[in-house]
Amino acid sequence: MVQRNAPKKAVHFGAGNIGRGFVACFLHNSGYEVIFAEVNDTTVQKLNSQKSYKVIEVGADGTSESTITNYRAINSRLNEAELVQEIATADLVTCSVGPHILKFLAPVIAKGIDARSTDLTPVAVIACENAIGATDTLAEFIKAPENTNPDRLADYDKRARFANSAIDRIVPAQDPDAGLDVRLEKFYEWVVERTPFADHEPPAVEGIHWVDNLQPFIERKLYTVNTGHATAAYHGYIRRKSTVYDALQDREIQEEVKKALANTASLITQKHGIPQDEQQAYVDKIVRRISNPHLEDAVERVGRAPLRKLSRKERFIGPAAELAEHGKDCGALLDAAEMAFRFQNVEGDDESFKLAEIMEQNGPEDVVKQVCGLEPKEKLFPAVVDVVKRVQADTQSD
């Protein structure tokens, strides 16, 4: 196993705001050439014609800028062969495309790994998504028989290692005239599991915090940051607030957020042994972050994709189901889920229209099974059925 005798190279799928502003920024600062794999040809052309862009970090103490260079872009839809060769010789493959897109990345990544020499250090594959076990999910797609010959799996760890991660950074909607520049908050957290690299050094990336057990970090993040952010957005949308900041100036909404995070805190502290005062300090910090007036974010943008956010392993149903099984309070999470069920027919969000269709065409029990992935035997099931009944009754009376 040898290192490539070449500058460090990373392939990143997804040249959106998180890809350019968060992941690529750290890769650039760590000395990697970044190859963006992107399906939007306009974005590909912009990246290839513009040799730098700015990342603007916004905080209570003002703003700071950094310039990102040393990157290229490949249209992954049109130039697969070129992308396969880049993956075959990359040190690192990352992505920020949304959990539902991972299956579409798998074929080309599988081809790149298959073409990789076992003389090289295995390529590190890290999915940077708001989902528990996203890299495991991607790995399953990559190793599936339709993408990888099963005979090649025997020595697969000589070609690739897969590490789950938890990412945390608020990237609001951008100015339409910003071009490639990205504006985001100064705070960040990028935690990656170390165990897949037990027999050699993990990739050197500035900003990554390597841990042996990722689950406490990713659940704390998903069930605090994402739960809090979405709770504010959905309650804010129903109360006709324009931004998350506006929503959190409303005392009632602020209380709803705090109650939801008290629900999740009780799960996190018990399940992962995190001291209550430490978790409360984390909650307080998160509420301050999502209340940042410099990161104006429309409630419609933060609330988009309600079907995903109401799913079984996501920010509301995931923690609520665990709490219910232990007989613990999850009332505020159910209240937030109710607001998410009311997020229907929102312009620009396909899932909100699909949600309205599901709610109209199905009985409450079937809605809960289909949308939330809950089964009747689970203790949370009847409570969510009641939520759906309430929303359906109100919708029919409108």
UniProtKB/Swiss-Prot annotation:
Gene Ontology cellular component list: cytosol
Reaction catalysed by this enzyme: D-mannitol 1-phosphate + NAD(+) = beta-D-fructose 6-phosphate + NADH + H(+)
Positions bound to NAD(+): A10, V11, H12, F13, G14, A15, G16, N17, I18, G19, R20, G21
Annotated active site: K221
Single annotated GO MF: mannitol-1-phosphate 5-dehydrogenase activity
Gene Ontology biological process terms from the UniProt entry: mannitol catabolic process
InterPro entries the record matches: 6-PGluconate_DH-like_C_sf (IPR008927), 6PGD_dom2 (IPR013328), Mannitol_1_phos_5_DH (IPR023028), Mannitol_DH (IPR000669), Mannitol_DH_C (IPR013118), Mannitol_DH_N (IPR013131), NAD(P)-bd_dom_sf (IPR036291)
UniProt keyword list: NAD, Oxidoreductase
One Pfam family cited in the UniProt record for this chain: Mannitol_dh
Enzyme Commission no: 1.1.1.17
Broad EC category: oxidoreductase
NCBIfam families for this protein: PRK02318.2-5
General function of this protein: Catalyzes the NAD(H)-dependent interconversion of D-fructose 6-phosphate and D-mannitol 1-phosphate in the mannitol metabolic pathway.
Family: Belongs to the mannitol dehydrogenase family.
PANTHER family named in the record: ALTRONATE OXIDOREDUCTASE-RELATED, MANNITOL-1-PHOSPHATE 5-DEHYDROGENASE
Protein name: Mannitol-1-phosphate 5-dehydrogenase
Species this chain originates from: Chaetomium globosum (strain ATCC 6205 / CBS 148.51 / DSM 1962 / NBRC 6347 / NRRL 1970) (Soil fungus)
